[in-house]
Amino acid sequence: MSKILVGLKRVVDYNVRVRVKPDGTGIVTDGVKMSINPFDEIALEEALRIREKGAATEVVVVSIGPADAQQQLRTGLAMGADRAILVQSDSTVEPLAAARIFLKLIEKEAPQIVLLGKQGIDDDNNQTGQMLAALWNRPQATFASRVELDGAKARVTREVDAGLETLEIDLPAVITTDLRLNEPRYVKLPEIMKAKKKPLETIAIADLGVDTASQFRTVKYDPPAARSKGVMVKDVNELVAALKQKGLIQ
């Protein structure tokens, strides 16, 4: 095996309390901390572990987004990726368009594995990996909680409603990662400094010749409804009375 391609999406940091714009057209991102999508960070960690075991020789991180996404790619390089590719786009790229972009990069890079987070924490679409596998006409294993490689095959364990399911797939393939797969490494200052010298290629999205036309339109964003304050009751009888008063029971 030679190469692993890893997708890194730029998202609002999971510790940030997201605010909806007053006009409901989106969320406030000005001055907000941005980070690597946590599921993608796990995908990168798994790729690095595979390389460290000698099952891959190169890890390439890819991001589709604005010029500022270079920050997240540099973080990926600091974690240990060998090089980075930014497909620059100032507009939102939907899952199908993202899958088409990855397919173009696959034609150029010829990876054995494409590792993606199972979903982004911003839109929670959970679609790009599946769409990419279909376009590439290669096997897929989603929600991976364990990945084992054996030559030209991968054995992937995934959590399903009934318990655990283990799939064996031929490579090349697409694998999407769940939070239980691993714990990403901590990036130290020397690695951050080294990452500045690693190659980062920028490609204009228009140069790929990919149809990125929007397939749907977001009508409005609404913040979650405010929760009413809880009511303390002394005993079961008082609880029953309160539920009857609200018409929840008869």
Where are these regions (language model features)?
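N-terminal glycine-rich FAD/FM-binding segment characteristic of electron-transfer flavoproteins
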Residues: 1-250
